[in-house]
Amino acid sequence: MTAKARIRAVDRFIKGLKEDNLYNDINAACVMAGWDSLAGALTPLKGAAPTNNGLSVYDRGIGIAGDGSSAYLDSNRNNTADPQNDNHNAVFVSSPPTSASVYIAAGSSGGQQNGSNNLGVTDGVFCRNRSGIPLVSLGSASADGLVAVSRSSAAAITTRISGESTTSSLASQSPLSEEVTVFARRSGASVDFYSDATIPFFSIGSATDLAALDARVSTLMADLRAIEETGFDKDAIAYLRAVEEADGAFLETDVKVAINSLVAGLKADKLWESMKACCL
């Protein structure tokens, strides 16, 4: 991935956020894909740099993977930093978790803490936002793309899952004073609900237009994946898209490179046209 292409993609993203009046709603965020190293992925777009607690698996095409057992990010932004009725939390999911866990949270570890924030999955997507009792079954647990919640009133929240926005009644409470974490939830010294999802973006801030944010983040992620695929065979790209659609998750960069090498090699050896049906 060339530096110039990365810069163009991120520049387009930031300009788009500003054009859509979203940029000032984001108070802490990381673009955790596209960079050559984990350190680059954890450089903040806005806000303080997050603290890495054990995360080590990084793919520049699809982001950082949790381990589902002990690793998480501390965003170093407190849940109280945004007003009670003016808040959003969002992640972009490249690969959903394999078990019940949270994407992004503040509090509620081991119980229903008033004023906590949780966005994660059990049988479906569940959400707390300045609340103790969660809303559940808001969307599929296997949903990829933007998963987000925004609150702009004391009475209701809006969630964004699988490209659809839904407004639900959920009374707000005074926000719990806890650091917002990604890949797990923490209350004091207790950390639980670790996730093995792969996440290339998170943001925290004031209430925002989730549909517009979804469009901008999805475009950025598509741009970064396209840069990774520069020079790929068109038939390899078509196959990659079909596999990702069937799996409901984005493929790791090494897998994409291997498949492209296979297709290109078959064509170089004049074998491709003789293959009428094939599965990997």
What are these regions (language model features)?
Residues M1-L280:
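Polar, enzyme-active/binding microenvironments
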